[in-house]
């Protein structure tokens, strides 16, 4: 009996009489109170780590001005679109940190619709934003999407791509950004609802609705196919920022028709002069929901993309700047590649102008610049590792306009 009374908890020192029951270990005892305390402390530590992780992201969240400045380092022009995106991104992640509610006011998602011609920087803007915040990023082509049950890519495959890009970490995926390109290609075939199935148009818009607004998407693990007995990974899409982009060719005519009431016919009609002509950018800034509905987007889908950022067409000066100014400018990239072979690469100002003109003629925007540069340097890069004593390669306007070889200068 004496030994029993002297048995005490190794942590708090209380006797067995005080605590009722002790659990014996290899070199001591622990009471129920200390077990509860340990459990509480461990739980608090786990919560603190989660809060610290959230605070870390909070601290990293840049202001709209800082977001805009970062975009300026990689994307030339598009000032209005950058400002719209900076505010939308900031508000979206602030919403996540607040738990979607502030004083019982529920904060809505600020998904973004980018409207602009091919090669104007829509994809680059989305990629740059994701890279800046170090969040997972996935890109999908709307033209490959179909409704579930039809041949093509299921809309939930987009979430799967996002999961793959963060090693299937659900929490990280739920803070990610998804960019859906060519969104203008999934318009319904007519402005009136159809009784026939439109599996790659209105049907896809309907399938994307819930995902963009916010739902719990069930995704098969590690890229497998769905089957009834399978355990699914569940992802809350209400926390994911969706950015959709498209050229929307012909939308400007719909806007112009609405904006310009005067038809220019009849004695009292308002005749438009040259000064009344609006640029594509000016027209897109006046876009209304009704214009997108007339274009073929369903009202419910447009309602899930409240932030619209129009991008302007790139002129010759903008294309020249794209070639030389950004941190990852094309000319800098190729100069770095040649530098690895201890060879200097020079582009004359005239050659830059010629490349910009060529891209404008092809109507491919900034996207076409890489293929132009790659084309003129292909043979040189092919021979480069075998060339001895090569010191410098010069690209002038004749290389672009006449198809001549770049000038080689040897040591």
From Swiss-Prot:
Signal peptide start and end residues: none
Which is one Pfam family of this protein? zf-C4_ClpX
Record function comment: ATP-dependent specificity component of the Clp protease. It directs the protease to specific substrates. Can perform chaperone functions in the absence of ClpP.
Q: Which Gene3D superfamilies does this UniProt record tie to the protein?
A: 1.10.8.60, ClpX chaperone, C4-type zinc finger domain (6.20.220.10), P-loop containing nucleotide triphosphate hydrolases (3.40.50.300)
Q: Which InterPro entries match?
A: AAA+_ATPase (IPR003593), ATP-dep_Clp_protease_ClpX (IPR050052), ATPase_AAA_core (IPR003959), Clp_ATPase_C (IPR019489), Clp_protease_ATP-bd_su_ClpX (IPR004487), ClpX_bact (IPR046425), P-loop_NTPase (IPR027417), Znf_CppX_C4 (IPR010603)
Q: Oligomeric state and partners?
A: Component of the ClpX-ClpP complex. Forms a hexameric ring that, in the presence of ATP, binds to fourteen ClpP subunits assembled into a disk-like structure with a central cavity, resembling the structure of eukaryotic proteasomes.
This protein is called: ATP-dependent Clp protease ATP-binding subunit ClpX
Record: residues binding Zn(2+): 9, 12, 31, 34
Any Gene Ontology biological process: cell division
A GO molecular function held by the record: ATP binding
PANTHER family on file: ATP-DEPENDENT CLP PROTEASE ATP-BINDING SUBUNIT CLPX-LIKE, MITOCHONDRIAL, ATP-DEPENDENT CLP PROTEASE ATP-BINDING SUBUNIT CLPX-LIKE, MITOCHONDRIAL-RELATED
Tell me its family: Belongs to the ClpX chaperone family.
Q: Is ATP-binding set as a keyword in this record?
A: yes
Mind listing the UniProt keywords for this protein, alphabetically? ATP-binding, Chaperone, Metal-binding, Nucleotide-binding, Zinc
Domain ClpX-type ZB: from-to ranges: 1-50
Gene Ontology CC: HslUV protease complex
The UniProt record gives the binding positions of ATP as: 117-124
């Amino acid at each position: 009996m004496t030994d029993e009374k002297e048995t005490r908890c190794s942590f708090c020192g209380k006797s067995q009489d005080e605590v009722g029951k002790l659990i014996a270990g290899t070199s001591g005892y622990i009471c129920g109170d200390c077990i509860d305390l340990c459990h509480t402390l461990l739980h608090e530590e786990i919560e603190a780590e989660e809060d610290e992780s959230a605070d870390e992201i909070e601290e990293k969240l840049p202001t709209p001005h800082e977001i805009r400045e970062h975009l300026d380092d990689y994307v030339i022009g598009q000032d209005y679109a950058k400002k719209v995106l900076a505010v939308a991104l900031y508000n979206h992640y602030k919403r996540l940190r607040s738990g979607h509610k502030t004083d019982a006011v529920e904060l809505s998602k600020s998904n973004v619709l980018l409207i602009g011609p091919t090669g104007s920087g829509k994809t680059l803007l989305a990629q740059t934003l994701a890279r800046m915040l170090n969040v997972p990023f996935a890109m999908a082509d709307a033209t490959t999407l179909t409704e579930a049950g039809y041949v093509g890519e299921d809309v939930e495959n987009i979430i799967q791509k996002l999961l793959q890009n963060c090693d299937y970490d659900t929490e990280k995926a739920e803070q990610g950004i998804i960019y859906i390109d060519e969104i203008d290609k999934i318009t319904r075939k007519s402005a009136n609802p159809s009784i026939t199935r439109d599996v790659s148009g209105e049907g896809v818009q309907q399938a994307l609705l819930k995902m963009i607004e916010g739902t719990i998407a069930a995704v098969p693990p590690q890229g497998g196919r769905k089957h009834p007995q399978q355990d699914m990974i569940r992802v809350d899409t209400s926390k994911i920022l969706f950015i959709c982009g498209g050229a929307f060719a012909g939308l400007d005519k719909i806007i112009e028709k609405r904006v310009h009431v005067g038809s220019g016919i009849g004695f009292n009609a308002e005749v438009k002069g040259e000064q009344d002509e609006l640029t594509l950018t000016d027209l897109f800034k006046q876009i209304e929901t009704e214009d997108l509905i007339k274009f073929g987007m369903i009202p419910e889908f447009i309602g899930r993309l409240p932030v619209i950022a129009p991008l302007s067409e790139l002129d010759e000066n903008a294309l020249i700047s794209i070639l030389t100014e950004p941190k990852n400018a094309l000319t800098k990239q190729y100069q770095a590649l040649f530098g690895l072979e201890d060879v200097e690469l020079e582009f004359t100002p005239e050659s830059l102008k010629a490349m910009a003109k060529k891209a404008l003629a092809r109507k491919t925007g900034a996207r076409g610049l890489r293929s132009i540069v790659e084309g003129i340097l292909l043979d040189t890069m092919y021979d480069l590792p075998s060339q001895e004593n090569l010191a410098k390669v010069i690209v002038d306007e004749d290389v672009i306009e006449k198809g001549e070889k770049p000038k080689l200068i040897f040591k």
